[in-house]
Amino acid sequence: MIGMAEKKVKVKTPSGKEAELAPEKVWVLAPKGRKGVKIGLFKDPETGKYFRHKLPDDYPV
């Protein structure tokens, strides 16, 4: 369920800026028997802090 991806996504960083970043890790977060959401782990280029953000449904896992 955890994959690596290179496709860039427009996300809002913790510092409040919009940036186009590629997630370092992608996984699906889903309750049993229901459709899940895709979550990506991103690294803020300015501060170096990691943060999570929801990805579009058509994003490859």
UniProtKB/Swiss-Prot annotation:
Keywords per UniProt: Chromosome, Cytoplasm, DNA-binding, Methylation
Record GO terms (molecular function): double-stranded DNA binding
Predominant localisation class: cytoplasm
Subcellular location field: Chromosome; Cytoplasm
GO cellular component terms, semicolon-separated: chromosome; cytoplasm
Modified how: Methylated at multiple sites, to varying extents.
HAMAP family reported for this sequence: Chromatin_Cren7 (MF_01387)
Self-association state and partner proteins as the record states: Monomer.
Entry similarity comment: Belongs to the Cren7 family.
Function text: A chromatin protein, binds double-stranded DNA without sequence specificity. Constrains negative DNA supercoils.
Name of the protein described by the UniProt record: Chromatin protein Cren7
Species classification: Archaea, Thermoproteota, Thermoprotei, Sulfolobales, Sulfolobaceae
